[in-house]
Amino acid sequence: MEGNLIKINKWLYPVSWIYGTGVWLRNKLFDWGIYKERKFDIPVISVGNITVGGTGKTPHTEYLIRLLQKDYKVAVLSRGYKRKSKGFVLARPDTSVQMIGDEPFQMKQKFPDIHMAVDRDRCHGIEQLCNSHIAPGTEVIILDDAFQHRYVKPGINILLVDYHRLICEDTLLPAGRMREPENGKSRAHIVIVTKCPKDITPMDLRVLSKQMELYPYQQLYFTTLTYGKLHPLFTAGNAVSLKEIEKDKHILLVTGIASPAKLIQDLSPYNEHIESLAFSDHHDFTARDMELIKKRFMKLPEGKRMIITTEKDSVRLAAHPLMDEMLKPYIYMLPIEVAFLQDQQELFNSNITDYVRKNSRNSNFS
């Protein structure tokens, strides 16, 4: 198996112990019933993690949307991280990325028929989505990044674990990157190890299964990332596959994601001239950032250069008022999807659709 990317600062263990005590107490207050969890009379599926950084929540949420939207009216509820608005917001055709955040905006653009809403208070958000006057016809709700939001008790709780940062090898913040102890995984009905190498062996998967130490009631799946064709962000040109990129093309990879190293690693086999310009996750591009992007691009060989960015970053770049017109023809967006390994897709799909079918009823809440 590949080496992991985990770096633990042992000097911060005392602070992690204090932090862990607070997290333990909070979870116990829910376990003891002092803090109340609400169960809603509508299928609710939660997707989330117990670590900071990217585990692939958005592509897995989008997978669920694709799976369910052909038979059900799907609503997705997110916190709307770094949005400029407050409270409950239901996305409309003219809703901006600033109002709901980059990932919700991305999902609404890709799936215009879903109800896409943001609300920090997930219980309130679900109530609004169950209101036929606000979000007509809602039949199933997907909670994006809600594994630790325990005020809602979902029917299916999906925990995502990054293959490169296994929770069994990590530790609590700030020494590590875990937001709660590993035993928090016990709340999950389904655990998915994400970002697995495409060529991972059956033996490695068996080792991983043992390392995860799941309970008998839990299901374990493995997924990998797949990349679609590059789409021009501002022009009407044709999409281009990664294999079609000329070998002498020089690429400026502009990202504002949690783990750009994995993306660089995945793109390297297609081109050896990749320069990375990495910003923080959900980065709000400033005027200085836009100038830096242009400056770095102009240093690449003329006639042999392009800019590649992620879907999540593309929605912020496309809406940026200071985007240089000269750069627009050279910017391409790289879509990402997930694929299940070991022929697990059919089993996963049936488990999700069976749950939704058996629990579909009037969307009242209690």
From Swiss-Prot:
* UniProt GO cellular component terms: plasma membrane
Q: Does the keyword Nucleotide-binding apply?
A: yes
- Identify the enzyme class: transferase
Matching Pfam families, A to Z? LpxK
Q: Which reaction does it catalyse?
A: a lipid A disaccharide + ATP = a lipid IVA + ADP + H(+)
Which EC number(s) are documented for this chain?
Answer: 2.7.1.130
Q: Mind listing the UniProt keywords for this protein, alphabetically?
A: ATP-binding, Kinase, Lipid A biosynthesis, Lipid biosynthesis, Lipid metabolism, Nucleotide-binding, Transferase
Q: What family does this belong to?
A: Belongs to the LpxK family.
Q: What does this protein do?
A: Transfers the gamma-phosphate of ATP to the 4'-position of a tetraacyldisaccharide 1-phosphate intermediate (termed DS-1-P) to form tetraacyldisaccharide 1,4'-bis-phosphate (lipid IVA).
The name this protein carries in UniProt is: Tetraacyldisaccharide 4'-kinase
The organism encoding this protein is Phocaeicola vulgatus (strain ATCC 8482 / DSM 1447 / JCM 5826 / CCUG 4940 / NBRC 14291 / NCTC 11154) (Bacteroides vulgatus)
Lineage, highest ranks first: Bacteria, Pseudomonadati, Bacteroidota, Bacteroidia, Bacteroidales
**Which gene specifies this protein's sequence?**
lpxK
